[in-house]
């Protein structure tokens, strides 16, 4: 019995010994971000900083600064010029400095601190007199706010210090920018978060407009930063002795070709900012009086263009160089004419920059609202661009540009909103930089910010850098190869549990979508995959991470539709479903055709009614013109008729007096002139009274003729009499008077009056 109890105690659970410590829980592991998955096969860290992808902490409405700094860092020639001027700091010195500025996070400690803060908050809410605690919604792990918070808790934090003395320069905005770039380049971590506190302190100290926490303009900051860098570099160069100053501009192109090693060339010239960003505009003005053309050059660091609805960058540039008429108050002072003259003005580009910063003027001042208003015009921007509005003597007028960065403004107006940057890196495609969060995106994601609906994200500043046609062709070939590889991977492999594809550089796919396993290839053998299949959809966590207001991907719905990946559990499409689908398509097409025909019929009826109304209007105008002509003729006849005729007619109209034909009156007048030898007036018989009681004068008729018989003359006789009268001009004047003989009426006609 004792042995049995001992065996039970031996087989039972071991009792903890006195003083033994309980087993510790394993520390929580931070979640793996999409960026970390993309960088798993990067290899060794480079010394030029091209493989570093750091976010930037937002210190309250500093997103305008973060987005512009990210775009400038990933401009390879600009980054190399900043790091290598005036000299490049040795990597060893930078690594020693980073030992104190680069701090790695303790994820477990951060979680414990957060849990302790939550408990303290709950305890404070339970105190008597405290306001009732509002029920909190669970955190959305796909939101950008949650991702930014997790990045601040898990990723290394990089502080920047003032190292201007090591550069041999006084502290300025350029030296603080150099501190940022060198810290990232020398970091042994590919990912992390920069704290640009020192840079912001210098910016606010030197420029009062950035001292407030108000929303700032990213384009204004870009222009100010480039001008400040130029001013700081030239000011330091002026302090150096003459032999150590900048080289001639002819050597500046070679001096900016920098390598990534610590002993690389340095941009000895101070014009490296001009060589990269500066272009030259030529204003051509032609006087319309003397036709003399005058030219005036001006430089620019960024090009601002006006926008039009449903247009493109090319059309905006065409409008920028369109001819402008200078007239009225804007007349041009012509030196050749010596005064103000009307002229035509046109802007052309004389020298193209290596990096073209294109500012889309989305904020326009309106007189009605008396303030700036954001324009949500749809403006399409291409991946590759050629500028056509160049002068005839321009250097390299066929220069080809490629889009490498887009600064996006999210918000309904210029006084609030959020800025993010979408940047094309050297080896890892396009990345979204949203303050602390950095995520890979697809190439088509860049096309979601044309800006055609209010309240959504719009491209604000476009960065184009020079490239060659060979590089573009090589890139397209590489994209086709990657696309074919991704299609093969979809056919032969499966996705990970989190939905991220194995092939690097591709966007996330929906985790709900699955692909066929290798064991069932026959199910989809009848599907023919095109080699130019579109890329996959972004991951849902990627699409949801850009919610408003700090999220540009609210326009993710505008992404072109992509055929979904077939589900492994779905059955093949049956013939019945195919027939019903085709019937629906045919019914839809028939419905659209009938609607179009109905609309055309309505338009035809509207056009016909418009033609009828126009015809009626023209008829009314013709009738009114005839009536006005008759009235004016009657008035003219009354003015030119003899006084005795006016007295005897007692107000008869011209129509009553003019009832006789002109040929009849000519014939009768000829007979009167022949019968009268003394050119004296023949007594006129009184005409019977007219309808209104007035009497008309009547000429004396030859023997054997009556007024009625005279009216029976044929047309031929009348024409002969007219011809004889016209051939005998001596009878045109009567007697010794210089006036034309007046003709009297013998016949009353009331038909026209009636």
From Swiss-Prot:
Source domain of life? Eukaryota
List all Polar residues biased stretches.
Answer: 253-269, 692-708
Region ranges (Disordered): 1-31, 118-145, 236-269, 494-754
* Pfam families to which the protein is assigned, alphabetical: UCH
What are the alphabetically sorted keywords of the record?
Coiled coil, Hydrolase, Protease, Thiol protease, Ubl conjugation pathway
Q: Which residues form the active site?
A: 63, 418
Compositional bias (Basic residues): 653-665, 733-754
**Chain intervals with Low complexity compositional bias:** 546-559
Q: Write out the biased-composition intervals (Basic and acidic residues).
A: 236-245, 576-647, 717-732
Q: Name one GO molecular function term.
A: cysteine-type deubiquitinase activity
- So what EC number does this one have? 3.4.19.12
Sorted alphabetically, the Gene Ontology cellular component annotations on this record are:
cytosol; nucleus
Could you say which protein family the record assigns here?
A: Belongs to the peptidase C19 family.
Subunit info here reads:
Interacts with creA, creC and qutD.
Outline what the protein does.
Ubiquitin thioesterase component of the regulatory network controlling carbon source utilization through ubiquitination and deubiquitination involving creA, creB, creC, creD and acrB. Deubiquitinates the creA catabolic repressor and the quinate permease qutD. Also plays a role in response to carbon starvation and the control of extracellular proteases activity.
Q: What is the name attached to this protein's record?
A: Probable ubiquitin carboxyl-terminal hydrolase creB
Q: What is the protein's species of origin?
A: Aspergillus oryzae (strain ATCC 42149 / RIB 40) (Yellow koji mold)
